[in-house]
């Protein structure tokens, strides 16, 4: 598919100055010494990591671990995926020469260069948040093979040239393949239209997941941050995105898909105004395991409310209202924890990504947080990707100028 798109650009005679890839975090492929992929990558929602955090923390101290990598412990993290493979004596892990996160793998196919981009590596729970290099202590303690962890490349740099055969096949010639914020959240946060004096700059990257946090200069590696379940992820310009991963619009997406499958399809422009008028006194914990991947999301919500003495939603509008006000309540809880760890409380909240189009959720969030909400851009990830390519090419000076371009463009 990537080559098809590049061929289309070549056929139109377009001059391509750069190519860059960003994706979701934590997932990876393993390649052998000959560059062959050792089996298809496994989705982070796979059950193989079940119980792995408990296994890992029998061997390493969680507080000391957080003080090094500053990562929110989540069962889906690369650390636990790799440890599950080690426990299972995976032949793929034994034969692996390189670990490549999803965007690293695609970049490898385009360039032949096997390296690991900083922001995507920071989702693994295997990166030292201070040195921005691998957390060799944890890697060694768990007996993971050192040699699979490659050179870290920073966003805003060239990670390789388009392979000659692909350059000829697509008609594009020599093109730089650029390291951007390969973790889509990092690219999205780069495109937050904040001003230089807006510190700390607070954001919610709103999609399937909601990533709520601030951009800071140095990681926060305190016990308070660990207990509050915040993570230090890599950002553009060497900055840190200090955030919490929250189940976002996943619940809404599942509801809409379920209703469609049952012949009860709903349109957002119809159901959201109905939810605006609905009233229900129920707040559900959106991160609860009950809502991770149930057979029926609607039934999971109804059952949770019934078994926890909450008002049970009777209509689709009440279900949607319950979900959105619960999300806003979770945002408020996370922001309260965040403010306790910052030198001053946040003054406004930027909501970016597809979820920024949900005006009801934006309003509920503003009310719950008690601060103004600034919505957009919707395509923050794409904008951040492209403008970081411009940064690598010297067309943009720094992250502040990048954000000025965003402000002038929306």
Task: Show which residues each predicted segment covers.
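N-terminal glycine/serine-rich phosphate-binding loop of ATP-dependent small-molecule kinases
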Residues: 1-39, 67, 95, 167-177, ...
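Short beta-strands and strand-loop turn motifs
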Residues: 66-67, 117-120, 146
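Short beta-strand to alpha-helix junction loop
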Residues: 130-131, 155-159
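Carbohydrate-associated surface elements
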Residues: 46
């Amino acid at each position: 598919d990537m080559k098809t798109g590049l061929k289309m650009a070549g056929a139109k005679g377009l001059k391509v100055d750069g190519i860059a890839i960003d994706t979701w975090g934590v997932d990876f492929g393993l390649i052998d010494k000959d560059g062959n992929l050792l089996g298809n990558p496994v989705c982070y929602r796979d059950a193989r990591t079940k119980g792995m955090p408990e296994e890992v923390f029998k061997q390493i101290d969680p507080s000391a671990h957080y003080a090094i990598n500053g990562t929110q412990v989540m069962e889906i993290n690369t650390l636990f995926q790799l440890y599950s493979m080690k426990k299972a004596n995976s032949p793929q892990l034994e034969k692996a020469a390189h670990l490549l996160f999803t965007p690293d793998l695609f970049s490898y196919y385009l360039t032949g260069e096997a390296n690991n981009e900083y922001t995507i590596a920071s989702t693994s729970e295997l990166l030292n948040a201070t040195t921005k290099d691998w957390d060799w202590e944890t890697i060694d303690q768990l007996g993971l093979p050192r040699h699979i962890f490659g050179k870290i490349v920073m966003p805003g740099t060239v990670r390789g040239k388009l392979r000659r055969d692909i350059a000829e096949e697509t008609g594009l010639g020599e093109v730089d393949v650029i390291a951007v914020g390969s973790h889509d959240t990092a690219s999205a946060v780069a495109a937050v239209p904040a001003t230089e004096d807006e510190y700390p700059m607070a954001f919610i990257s709103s999609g399937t997941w909601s990533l709520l946090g601030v951009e800071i200069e140095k990681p926060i590696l305190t016990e308070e941050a660990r207990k509050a379940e915040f993570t230090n992820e890599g950002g553009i310009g060497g900055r840190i995105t200090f955030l919490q991963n929250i189940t976002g619009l996943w619940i809404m997406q599942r509801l809409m898909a379920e209703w469609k499958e049952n012949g009860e399809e709903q349109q957002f422009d119809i159901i959201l105004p109905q939810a605006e008028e609905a009233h229900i006194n129920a707040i559900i914990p959106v991160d609860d395991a009950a809502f991770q991947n149930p057979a029926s999301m609607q039934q999971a919500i109804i059952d949770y409310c019934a078994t926890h003495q909450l008002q049970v939603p009777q209509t689709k509008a009440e279900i949607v209202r319950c979900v959105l006000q619960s999300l806003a309540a979770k945002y408020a809880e996370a922001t309260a924890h965040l403010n306790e760890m910052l030198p001053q409380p946040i003054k406004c909240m930027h909501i970016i990504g597809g979820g920024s189009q949900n005006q009801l959720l934006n309003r509920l969030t503003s009310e719950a947080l008690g601060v103004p909400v600034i919505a957009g851009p919707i395509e923050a990830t794409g904008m951040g990707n492209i403008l970081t390519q411009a940064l690598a090419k010297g067309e943009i000076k720094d992250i502040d100028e990048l954000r000025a371009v965003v402000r002038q463009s929306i």
